[in-house]
């Protein structure tokens, strides 16, 4: 059989397929459909230093070939997460990647420090959160702020740090270079694209928050392009995501330069998506007589 193992900053994954934060919880519900042991990693929903209530409803609406969400990173906080979610995930033979959110550098660092002695494998830092100190502009939309938050997090982190990049910028490579300069171990991209939908019958916004994050198949070409650009701009390993629903989608990201892939919105319309994608990649390697998945990373130049 072709080799599916990939390495992210010293963390060995049995295959390159993982979940995308916010679409899989911590796997408790999906474990009824998917054998979590078969995943390269489970990426948890965002966790903050204190509970976050999230945004008012409606929070989700469908779009052509995708969806908009404005959940607002609702989560129970780090204490509940450590007591409830980590013990559940430790029952499985898969890597645990904790997504961390915050409204200030102090918020992020509190969570990162708390996770230092927990049995988790990597940390993914969601820099699409609004920076309260800078008037609500997301950390990931300002290269200087991104470099600084990366440096701060790295001071406290005992696990490798993944910086999750926002696509809502003029130049994604500038952000990637800033995260690399700050000491990031891995980059993940893309987060959702900011979008809006109007309910014409009610003459108001479809989402209470007015705007939301767009995800699903419609964003894939943008995501593949950005992964390709970043792979050619920095030397860090990349986790690619954005509209992946099939093995063919995942392979596009890998060939563009991603070492691993995250499956998000597809989990909502197909709970078996992650394992089907892993099986599909394996079948492709066998059919193409490729001995090792790593041979395909960044093959397009």
Name the predicted role of every residue range.
Residues 48-53, 130-132, 194-197, 268-270:
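Short gly/pro/ser/thr-enriched loop/turn and capping motifs at secondary-structure boundaries
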Residues 17-20, 40-44, 96-100, 123-125, ...:
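Hydrophobic faces of well-ordered beta-strands that scaffold small-molecule active sites
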Residues 1-96:
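N-terminal capping/small domains of soluble enzymes
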Residues 93, 116-119, 157, 281-289:
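Structural signal for hydrophobic packing residues in well-ordered secondary-structure cores
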Residues 214-235, 239, 245-301:
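Alpha/beta catalytic cores of nucleotide-metabolism and tRNA/nucleoside-modifying enzymes
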Residues 14-27, 72-74, 97-108, 162-171, ...:
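Active-site mouth loops of central-metabolism enzymes
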Residues 32, 103-239, 248-256:
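Alpha/beta enzyme core
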Residues 12-14, 91-96, 156-161, 232-236, ...:
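Short, surface-exposed connector motifs at secondary-structure boundaries
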């Amino acid at each position: 059989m072709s080799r599916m193992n990939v390495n992210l900053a010293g963390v060995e994954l049995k295959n390159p397929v993982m979940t995308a934060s916010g679409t899989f919880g911590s796997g408790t519900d999906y474990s009824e459909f998917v054998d979590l042991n078969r995943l390269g990693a489970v990426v948890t929903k965002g966790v903050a230093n204190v509970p976050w209530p999230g945004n008012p409803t409606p929070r989700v609406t469908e779009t052509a070939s995708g969806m908009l969400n404005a959940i607002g990173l609702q989560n129970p906080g780090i204490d509940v997460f450590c007591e409830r979610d980590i013990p559940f995930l430790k029952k499985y033979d898969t890597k645990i990647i904790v997504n961390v959110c915050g409204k200030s550098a102090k918020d992020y660092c509190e969570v990162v420090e708390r996770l230092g002695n927990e049995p988790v494998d990597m940390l993914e830092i969601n820099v699409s959160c609004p920076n309260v100190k800078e008037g609500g502009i997301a950390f990931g939309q300002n290269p200087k702020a991104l470099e600084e938050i990366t440096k701060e997090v790295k001071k406290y982190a005992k696990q490798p740090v993944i910086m999750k990049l926002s696509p809502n910028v003029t130049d994604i490579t500038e952000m990637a270079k800033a995260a690399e300069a700050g000491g990031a171990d891995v980059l993940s991209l893309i987060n959702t694209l900011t979008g809006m939908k109007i309910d014409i019958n009610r003459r108001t916004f479809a989402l209470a928050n007015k705007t939301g994050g767009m995800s699903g198949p419609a964003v894939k070409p943008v995501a593949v392009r950005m992964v390709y650009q970043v792979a050619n701009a920095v030397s860090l390993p990349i986790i690619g995501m954005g509209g992946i629903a099939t093995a063919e989608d995942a392979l596009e990201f890998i060939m563009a330069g991603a070492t691993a892939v995250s499956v998000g919105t597809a989990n909502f319309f197909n709970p078996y998506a992650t394992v089907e994608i892993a099986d599909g990649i394996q079948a492709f390697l066998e059919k193409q007589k490729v001995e090792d998945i790593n041979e395909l990373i960044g093959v397009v130049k």
